[in-house]
Amino acid sequence: MLPFLKAPADAPLMTDKYEIDARYRYWRRHILLTIWLGYALFYFTRKSFNAAVPEILANGVLSRSDIGLLATLFYITYGVSKFVSGIVSDRSNARYFMGIGLIATGIINILFGFSTSLWAFAVLWVLNAFFQGWGSPVCARLLTAWYSRTERGGWWALWNTAHNVGGALIPIVMAAAALHYGWRAGMMIAGCMAIVVGIFLCWRLRDRPQALGLPAVGEWRHDALEIAQQQEGAGLTRKEILTKYVLLNPYIWLLSFCYVLVYVVRAAINDWGNLYMSETLGVDLVTANTAVTMFELGGFIGALVAGWGSDKLFNGNRGPMNLIFAAGILLSVGSLWLMPFASYVMQATCFFTIGFFVFGPQMLIGMAAAECSHKEAAGAATGFVGLFAYLGASLAGWPLAKVLDTWHWSGFFVVISIAAGISALLLLPFLNAQTPREA
């Protein structure tokens, strides 16, 4: 690893309580705002292509199967990258790891806008997926390092809204760009914005509290659950921690299988939702993408409710809130599918409620993985479940495109309804699991 990418060493520990408190308050706000902005732009460069899909299909640039193939390639590569990057990011300098990854995705989006062949699109989108994996594990590690167990749900939920803001704005940006300049201009705009913010991350983001001379967050907040997690596995090597607390941890595997199904639903609605609106209601690209924006708006609110509720109502136990939201996914998907009449307002409302319920488990499962693992393996644990999440998302690409071609939208909704129902069943063992960490 290049020297500047290595995690910074611990600085001499401060002793002045007032200075420690002041620095913790400043850096906790600063870290959250910085990773929030960075991840929102990761989302811009991840969903730029999806937002342009109706325009690309209308222009005959790619077929529906081509679109599904690119989505599947992206999700598989992104899932693998999240796991590998999670392991690497646990011992890397957060500011450069995340910043360089974002700059790379920006450059690739610009190149995508200049490309014309399916092979060029495929190669560039696989590369984009690889560098996209440099974002989320870093954020998970920093959220675990700067915020303790009994408060983390609320802070993690605030960061998680970056998904929704990025996901809500990029369809509007792409639709406006496509309307006036073509979809390629939208890809280039997203890429340029990502490069600027990536440079900002390299400049202003910081690593763990200990690298700034601060005590661990559990000691600072006197959080017994956090201190207990910090003290687990003392004396183990990184390889032993990874094996015991991630690869052989049954709770991590159960969360992973559940994540597969949650992401089938999330990716299906996110990637095919605008096409569903276009084909069933005959609306234009701007109107169709507005429905996807409602999905993200619902997710924005749902993530905040899920994070706050798991902290305040269940004392940091993510299981009950996860189950409630998983049941909500099934009901809201069924409402969109079985709606007896075609109405933009009602369908957009269903997109909102699906987003509300999907982004609860989307956030809480990743957080639960970090908390069910070792403190020094937070990035690896979230990366591991993320690998399975995007294997699930890949099923919403080419395989779901084939379902659409054969059984049309009825087959589409049958698949995602089954996925939602099974995901709820897999979360039952977590109802009473407060701190399951090892096998």
Swiss-Prot record:
Which Gene3D superfamilies does the record match to this protein?
A: MFS general substrate transporter like domains (1.20.1250.20)
Q: Which GO terms describe its biological process?
A: glucose-6-phosphate transport; phosphate ion transmembrane transport; phosphorelay signal transduction system
Q: Which Pfam families match?
A: MFS_1 (PF07690)
Q: Which InterPro entries match?
A: MFS (IPR011701), MFS_dom (IPR020846), MFS_trans_sf (IPR036259), OPA_Antiporter (IPR051337), Sugar-P_transporter_CS (IPR021159), Sugar_P_transporter (IPR000849)
Q: Name one GO molecular function term.
A: glucose 6-phosphate:phosphate antiporter activity
Residues spanning the membrane: 26-45, 67-87, 96-118, 122-144, 163-183, 185-205, 245-265, 290-310, 323-343, 350-370, 380-400, 411-431
Superkingdom, taxonomy of origin: Bacteria
UniProt topological domain (Periplasmic) ranges: 46-66, 119-121, 184, 266-289, 344-349, 401-410
Q: How does it sit in the membrane?
A: Multi-pass membrane protein
Q: Does the keyword Lipid biosynthesis apply?
A: no
Ordered alphabetically, the record's keywords are: Cell inner membrane, Cell membrane, Membrane, Transmembrane, Transmembrane helix
| Major place of residence | membrane
Q: Which PANTHER family match?
A: GLUCOSE-6-PHOSPHATE EXCHANGER SLC37A4
The entry assigns this protein to a family as follows: Belongs to the major facilitator superfamily. Organophosphate:Pi antiporter (OPA) (TC 2.A.1.4) family.
Which NCBIfam families does this chain map to?
2A0104, PRK11663.1
Q: What does this protein do?
A: Part of the UhpABC signaling cascade that controls the expression of the hexose phosphate transporter UhpT. UhpC senses external glucose-6-phosphate and interacts with the histidine kinase UhpB, leading to the stimulation of the autokinase activity of UhpB.
Tell me what this protein is called. Answer: Membrane sensor protein UhpC
Q: Which organism does this sequence originate in? A: Escherichia coli (strain K12)
Q: Source taxonomy lineage? A: Bacteria, Pseudomonadati, Pseudomonadota, Gammaproteobacteria, Enterobacterales
